Protein backbone atom coordinates (compact mmCIF):
# COMPACT_ATOMS: atom_id res chain seq x y z
CA UNK A 1 0.00 0.00 0.00
CA UNK A 2 2.84 2.41 0.88
CA UNK A 3 4.57 1.61 -2.41
CA UNK A 4 1.35 2.30 -4.31
CA UNK A 5 0.98 5.69 -2.59
CA UNK A 6 4.57 6.57 -3.50
CA UNK A 7 3.92 5.65 -7.12
CA UNK A 8 0.81 7.85 -7.15
CA UNK A 9 2.79 10.76 -5.68
CA UNK A 10 5.61 10.33 -8.21
CA UNK A 11 3.09 10.12 -11.06
CA UNK A 12 1.26 13.24 -9.85
CA UNK A 13 4.51 15.21 -9.51
CA UNK A 14 5.60 14.07 -12.97
CA UNK A 15 2.32 15.18 -14.52
CA UNK A 16 2.48 18.52 -12.67
CA UNK A 17 6.09 19.11 -13.77
CA UNK A 18 5.24 18.24 -17.37
CA UNK A 19 2.25 20.59 -17.29
CA UNK A 20 4.29 23.48 -15.87
CA UNK A 21 7.08 22.82 -18.37
CA UNK A 22 4.62 22.76 -21.28
CA UNK A 23 2.95 25.99 -20.13
CA UNK A 24 6.33 27.74 -19.96
CA UNK A 25 7.56 26.67 -23.38
CA UNK A 26 8.22 29.52 -25.79
CA UNK A 27 6.32 29.80 -29.06
CA UNK A 28 9.64 30.07 -30.87
CA UNK A 29 13.24 29.62 -29.64
CA UNK A 30 15.22 32.62 -28.46
CA UNK A 31 18.80 32.95 -29.68
CA UNK A 32 21.31 35.35 -28.14
CA UNK A 33 24.91 36.12 -29.07
CA UNK A 34 27.12 38.56 -27.20
CA UNK A 35 30.29 39.37 -25.33
CA UNK A 36 31.27 39.65 -21.68
CA UNK A 37 34.34 40.59 -19.72
CA UNK A 38 35.60 41.59 -16.32
CA UNK A 39 38.09 40.79 -13.60
CA UNK A 40 39.05 37.56 -11.89
CA UNK A 41 40.83 36.61 -8.66
CA UNK A 42 42.26 33.12 -8.42
CA UNK A 43 44.29 30.85 -6.20
CA UNK A 44 45.38 27.20 -6.04
CA UNK A 45 44.34 24.33 -3.84
CA UNK A 46 47.43 22.21 -3.18
CA UNK A 47 47.87 18.91 -1.38
CA UNK A 48 50.45 18.92 0.23
CA UNK A 49 49.57 22.51 1.05
CA UNK A 50 51.49 25.46 -0.37
CA UNK A 51 51.31 28.83 1.35
CA UNK A 52 49.75 31.05 -1.31
CA UNK A 53 47.46 34.04 -1.01
CA UNK A 54 43.76 33.30 -0.62
CA UNK A 55 41.33 34.18 -3.36
CA UNK A 56 40.28 37.51 -1.80
CA UNK A 57 43.87 38.80 -1.57
CA UNK A 58 45.17 37.54 -4.91
CA UNK A 59 46.08 39.99 -7.72
CA UNK A 60 43.25 40.65 -10.16
CA UNK A 61 43.50 39.52 -13.78
CA UNK A 62 41.30 40.02 -16.81
CA UNK A 63 38.94 37.65 -18.60
CA UNK A 64 36.36 37.85 -21.37
CA UNK A 65 34.86 36.17 -24.38
CA UNK A 66 31.84 35.27 -26.49
CA UNK A 67 28.45 34.11 -25.17
CA UNK A 68 25.85 32.03 -27.03
CA UNK A 69 22.48 31.34 -25.40
CA UNK A 70 19.64 29.21 -26.77
CA UNK A 71 16.26 29.02 -25.05
CA UNK A 72 13.10 27.06 -25.82
CA UNK A 73 11.72 27.56 -22.32
CA UNK A 74 10.96 30.65 -20.23
CA UNK A 75 13.03 29.40 -17.30
CA UNK A 76 15.83 27.19 -18.67
CA UNK A 77 18.32 27.77 -21.48
CA UNK A 78 21.61 26.42 -22.78
CA UNK A 79 24.59 28.76 -22.62
CA UNK A 80 27.94 28.07 -24.29
CA UNK A 81 30.92 30.41 -24.04
CA UNK A 82 34.39 30.71 -25.53
CA UNK A 83 36.59 32.72 -23.17
CA UNK A 84 40.12 33.91 -22.68
CA UNK A 85 41.01 33.99 -19.01
CA UNK A 86 43.94 34.04 -16.62
CA UNK A 87 44.26 32.07 -13.43
CA UNK A 88 47.09 31.08 -11.14
CA UNK A 89 48.37 31.92 -7.70
CA UNK A 90 50.56 34.30 -5.69
CA UNK A 91 53.04 33.62 -2.87
CA UNK A 92 54.26 36.27 -0.43
CA UNK A 93 57.82 35.90 0.89
CA UNK A 94 58.28 38.20 3.86
CA UNK A 95 56.20 39.69 6.64
CA UNK A 96 54.05 42.00 4.49
CA UNK A 97 53.46 43.08 0.91
CA UNK A 98 55.51 46.29 1.23
CA UNK A 99 58.74 44.80 2.56
CA UNK A 100 58.32 41.27 1.19
CA UNK A 101 58.57 39.74 -2.27
CA UNK A 102 55.50 38.69 -4.22
CA UNK A 103 55.86 35.68 -6.51
CA UNK A 104 52.99 35.56 -9.02
CA UNK A 105 52.23 32.82 -11.52
CA UNK A 106 49.77 33.52 -14.35
CA UNK A 107 48.36 30.76 -16.55
CA UNK A 108 46.58 31.90 -19.73
CA UNK A 109 43.67 29.73 -20.86
CA UNK A 110 41.12 29.37 -23.61
CA UNK A 111 38.07 27.88 -21.87
CA UNK A 112 34.67 26.65 -23.03
CA UNK A 113 31.91 26.42 -20.39
CA UNK A 114 28.70 24.46 -21.10
CA UNK A 115 26.12 25.96 -18.76
CA UNK A 116 22.51 25.47 -17.80
CA UNK A 117 21.04 28.97 -17.56
CA UNK A 118 18.06 29.36 -15.21
CA UNK A 119 16.27 32.71 -15.23
CA UNK A 120 13.63 33.89 -12.79
CA UNK A 121 11.67 37.09 -12.57
CA UNK A 122 9.89 39.51 -14.86
CA UNK A 123 10.28 39.59 -18.62
CA UNK A 124 12.63 42.58 -18.78
CA UNK A 125 14.52 42.37 -15.47
CA UNK A 126 15.47 38.90 -14.27
CA UNK A 127 17.86 37.15 -11.96
CA UNK A 128 19.67 34.06 -13.19
CA UNK A 129 21.78 31.12 -12.10
CA UNK A 130 24.38 29.43 -14.32
CA UNK A 131 25.74 25.97 -13.59
CA UNK A 132 27.72 23.44 -15.59
CA UNK A 133 31.04 21.89 -16.63
CA UNK A 134 33.85 23.62 -18.45
CA UNK A 135 37.01 22.62 -20.29
CA UNK A 136 40.11 24.66 -21.03
CA UNK A 137 43.61 24.63 -22.46
CA UNK A 138 46.59 26.60 -21.20
CA UNK A 139 48.16 28.51 -24.10
CA UNK A 140 50.88 30.30 -22.10
CA UNK A 141 52.31 30.78 -18.62
CA UNK A 142 54.35 33.55 -17.04
CA UNK A 143 56.06 34.28 -13.74
CA UNK A 144 56.42 37.69 -12.10
CA UNK A 145 58.56 38.60 -9.07
CA UNK A 146 57.96 41.99 -7.47
CA UNK A 147 61.61 42.27 -6.37
CA UNK A 148 63.85 40.90 -9.14
CA UNK A 149 66.88 40.99 -6.85
CA UNK A 150 65.27 38.78 -4.22
CA UNK A 151 66.36 35.18 -3.76
CA UNK A 152 63.49 32.69 -3.74
CA UNK A 153 64.29 29.06 -3.16
CA UNK A 154 63.01 26.87 -5.98
CA UNK A 155 60.07 24.68 -4.97
CA UNK A 156 57.96 22.09 -6.74
CA UNK A 157 55.13 24.50 -7.58
CA UNK A 158 57.62 26.75 -9.39
CA UNK A 159 58.23 24.12 -12.08
CA UNK A 160 56.59 24.53 -15.50
CA UNK A 161 53.10 23.04 -15.48
CA UNK A 162 52.78 19.52 -16.88
CA UNK A 163 49.03 19.43 -17.65
CA UNK A 164 47.78 22.07 -20.04
CA UNK A 165 44.31 20.58 -20.44
CA UNK A 166 41.89 21.60 -17.69
CA UNK A 167 38.38 20.54 -16.77
CA UNK A 168 36.10 21.52 -13.94
CA UNK A 169 32.82 23.15 -12.95
CA UNK A 170 31.44 26.67 -12.71
CA UNK A 171 28.49 28.29 -10.94
CA UNK A 172 27.34 31.88 -11.28
CA UNK A 173 24.69 34.28 -9.98
CA UNK A 174 23.61 37.41 -11.73
CA UNK A 175 20.91 39.59 -13.20
CA UNK A 176 20.12 41.10 -16.57
CA UNK A 177 17.99 43.83 -18.07
CA UNK A 178 16.39 43.06 -21.40
CA UNK A 179 15.59 46.12 -23.50
CA UNK A 180 13.05 46.14 -26.30
CA UNK A 181 15.41 47.39 -29.00
CA UNK A 182 19.09 47.37 -28.08
CA UNK A 183 19.67 43.97 -26.49
CA UNK A 184 20.42 42.54 -23.06
CA UNK A 185 22.78 43.95 -20.41
CA UNK A 186 23.88 41.60 -17.65
CA UNK A 187 26.06 41.36 -14.55
CA UNK A 188 27.35 38.06 -13.15
CA UNK A 189 29.58 36.81 -10.33
CA UNK A 190 30.96 33.33 -10.99
CA UNK A 191 32.98 30.76 -9.04
CA UNK A 192 34.96 28.09 -10.87
CA UNK A 193 36.91 25.10 -9.61
CA UNK A 194 39.23 22.82 -11.55
CA UNK A 195 38.79 19.08 -11.10
CA UNK A 196 42.02 18.33 -12.90
CA UNK A 197 45.48 19.56 -11.96
CA UNK A 198 48.14 21.77 -13.51
CA UNK A 199 50.78 19.29 -12.34
CA UNK A 200 50.78 15.50 -12.44
CA UNK A 201 48.85 14.39 -9.36
CA UNK A 202 48.25 11.09 -7.62
CA UNK A 203 49.90 8.58 -5.33
CA UNK A 204 53.00 8.35 -7.54
CA UNK A 205 53.57 12.11 -7.69
CA UNK A 206 54.51 14.85 -5.24
CA UNK A 207 51.15 16.63 -5.43
CA UNK A 208 47.94 14.79 -4.65
CA UNK A 209 45.99 17.84 -5.82
CA UNK A 210 46.96 21.03 -7.66
CA UNK A 211 43.68 22.62 -8.73
CA UNK A 212 43.00 26.26 -9.64
CA UNK A 213 39.89 28.01 -8.36
CA UNK A 214 38.66 31.47 -9.24
CA UNK A 215 36.06 34.13 -8.58
CA UNK A 216 35.13 36.52 -11.39
CA UNK A 217 32.79 39.46 -11.91
CA UNK A 218 31.70 40.16 -15.50
CA UNK A 219 29.61 42.64 -17.41
CA UNK A 220 27.97 41.39 -20.58
CA UNK A 221 25.98 42.48 -23.59
CA UNK A 222 23.86 40.09 -25.69
CA UNK A 223 21.92 40.67 -28.87
CA UNK A 224 18.72 38.72 -29.50
CA UNK A 225 18.49 37.30 -33.00
CA UNK A 226 14.85 36.23 -32.81
CA UNK A 227 12.20 38.24 -31.06
CA UNK A 228 9.21 36.66 -29.40
CA UNK A 229 5.83 37.38 -30.91
Model-found features: residue ranges?
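Gram-negative (and chloroplast) outer-membrane scaffold detector with strong preference
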Residues: 23, 27-31, 41-45, 69-147, ...
Amino acid sequence: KVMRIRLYIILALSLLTSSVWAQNRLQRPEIFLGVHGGVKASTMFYNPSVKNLDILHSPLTGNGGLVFRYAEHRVCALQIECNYMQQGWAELYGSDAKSGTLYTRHLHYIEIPFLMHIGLGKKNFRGFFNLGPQIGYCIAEETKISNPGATISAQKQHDPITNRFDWGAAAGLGCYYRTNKIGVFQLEARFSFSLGGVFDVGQLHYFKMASPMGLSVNLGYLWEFKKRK
